[in-house]
Amino acid sequence: MLKLLAFVALLSVSVSANVDMTGFGLPADNHKVALGGPIQESAGLADEGEQQLQLVDVSPQDEGQQNVAHVREMFSNVFNSIKTQREQAMAANGSQPTD
């Protein structure tokens, strides 16, 4: 019970303590901020009203077609690589394929 009370006391003190935030890259004018306190206007945070969304005009069908084309290209590259390696191995051995 005593350990619990000590923990609660330490927790309440740490939450209400002022913290030196210059070590985290914040400017010195607002480096004394209570944890859980309001954010000052000089904090340099963007106003949510200034944010803009970037719209991308891609339908799911177009995206699916792009994915299929990408997979086909990948398999084509793999098969061409295998074919080239087999041709090089056959040229080095002087043998014909036995497919």
Curated annotation (Swiss-Prot):
Keywords: Signal. It comes from the Eukaryota. Residues 1-16 form the signal peptide. This is Putative protein tag-209. The lineage of its organism: Eukaryota, Metazoa, Ecdysozoa, Nematoda, Chromadorea.
